Regions:
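Glycine-/small-residue-rich "gating" segment that lines the acyl/pantetheine channel
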Residues: 124-131, 169-172, 176, 180, ...
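Active-site-adjacent elements of ketosynthase-type condensing enzymes
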Residues: 43, 47-53, 110-114, 193-220, ...
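Conserved beta-ketoacyl condensing-enzyme motif
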Residues: 8, 24-25, 29-162, 191-202, ...
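Condensing-enzyme catalytic core mediating Claisen C-C bond formation in acyl metabolism
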Residues: 5-9, 36, 214-291, 300
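Active-site-proximal alpha-helical scaffold in enzymes
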Residues: 78-91, 140-144, 148-151, 156-192, ...
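Flexible, low-complexity linker/loop segments at domain and module junctions
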Residues: 1-8, 95-98, 291-297, 328, ...
Length: 412
């Protein structure tokens, strides 16, 4: 059976830099930081007191208030981004095509704020105060479940959980379902909402977060010599994927093609990347092989780029090992410098941004590179966006447990 082509026909996002594609992309290209002091809880006693918060989001624009009360915030974000993507795609689910449409939207952690609130209720008021909606309000596959119900989707309905690679893996696996003939259209991506006491406190305890409380907007500084950890973010990025001939037949707008998908495992450490970048190298090369693309065809790479001392260096080394001399010709960018790290939502949001980079032929900047680390010696599109030719782009995501993913996007 010949391999079916997969294209992107709809985009949606909720993010620290905007709550729709137009606003988010505009702020990203302008280099505006979405990192602010935490307002969702009193962070006075925490070592990190800032995050990439979603601002101005009205859940009732997407979900009736009565229903929204029975969902954790990550579900709100995922549903909203999914609804945006479906509207953008112009695709209609009908009784005739419903079994050929699927959804795979995941989360790295899921309903942590709901778990915190419910635990407090349990301790203070006893087990009878636990909401009957607690479990479906918290579990990770409920974004996919709600989108399936809302649109009448009767094909594959699942969610993946692979830490910070979740959103990318969801998109990659959704693309393969289309390639292999299991679906014609898929909604795919990731969402997260862990700007909460346990979310901030847990990563702070692991010494993973920046502590630059005096200037949150400059705290996320990938590849800068003075980077001191990542900044937690929240939101969602979701896209509609479609079989190419199916999209053409209905006259759909096509943003880009998903040409390749690769995965690898570090087999090294619970939280630290391989210092020689080998997991990243193998992952990128697997994606390029899957796409049938040579290394010298790649011009843009949206990196994992978390602003951690170990991670940024390991990814740089991995890129150089994968691309050889061509690595210096690639524009590498980290949009986390503006959004923070959305954990399981990051691969979804950043894949949306990568598709927009291909579609608009622009690399967003990596802001906050004030003193570039000499050991990180690639072109990181420092501080200003750049118009450029992008025929082939890569997107990397890496997660705790040594789980890696890379997507290859091509201009159509």
């Amino acid at each position: 059976m010949s391999r079916r082509r997969v294209v992107v026909t709809g985009l949606g996002l909720i993010s620290p830099v905007g709550n729709n594609v137009a606003d988010g992309w505009a702020d990203l290209v302008a280099g505006k930081s979405g990192i602010v002091n935490i307002t969702k809880f009193d962070a006075t006693n925490f070592s990190t007191r800032f995050a990439g918060e979603v601002k101005g989001f009205n859940v009732e624009d997407y979900i009736p208030a009565k229903e929204a009360r029975h969902m954790d915030t990550f579900i709100h974000y995922g549903i909203a981004a999914g609804m945006q993507a479906m509207q953008d795609s112009g695709f209609q689910v009908t009784d005739e095509n419903a079994e050929r449409v699927g959804v795979v939207v995941g989360s790295g952690i899921g309903g942590l704020p709901m778990i915190e609130v419910t635990q407090t209720e349990l301790l203070n008021r006893g087990p009878r105060r636990i909401s009957p909606f607690f479990v479906p309000a918290s579990i990770i596959n409920m974004i996919s479940g709600h989108l399936s119900i809302k649109f009448g989707i009767k094909g594959p309905n699942l969610a993946l959980v692979t830490a910070c690679t979740t959103g990318l893996h969801c998109i990659g696996e959704a693309a393969r379902l289309i390639e292999y003939g299991d679906a014609d259209v898929m909604i795919a991506g990731g969402a997260e909402a862990t700007v909460s006491p346990l979310g901030i406190g847990g990563f702070a305890a692991a010494r993973a977060l920046s502590q630059r409380n005096d200037d949150p907007a400059t705290a996320s500084r990938p590849w800068d010599k003075d980077r001191d950890g990542f900044v937690l973010g929240e939101g969602a990025g979701v896209m509609v994927l479609e079989e190419y001939e199916h999209a053409k037949a209905r006259g759909a707008k096509i943003y880009a093609e998903i040409a390749g998908y690769g995965m690898s495992g570090d087999a090294h450490h619970m939280t630290a990347p391989l210092e020689d970048g080998d997991g990243a190298r193998r992952c990128m090369l697997a994606a390029l092989r899957n796409a049938g693309v040579n290394v010298d065809q790649v011009s843009y790479l949206n990196a994992h780029g978390t602003s951690t001392p170990l991670g940024d260096l390991a990814e740089t080394i991995g890129i150089k090992r994968a691309f050889g001399d061509h690595a210096k010709q690639i524009v590498v960018n980290s949009t986390k410098s503006m959004t923070g790290h959305l954990l399981g939502g990051s691969g979804g949001l950043e894949s949306v941004f990568t598709v927009l980079a291909v579609h608009n032929q622009v690399s967003p900047p990596t802001i906050n590179i004030f003193n570039q680390d000499p050991a990180c010696d690639l072109d990181y599109c420092a501080n200003e966006a750049r118009e450029m030719k992008i025929d082939v782009a890569l997107k990397n995501s890496f997660g705790f447990g040594g789980t890696n993913g890379t997507l290859v996007f091509k201009r159509v």
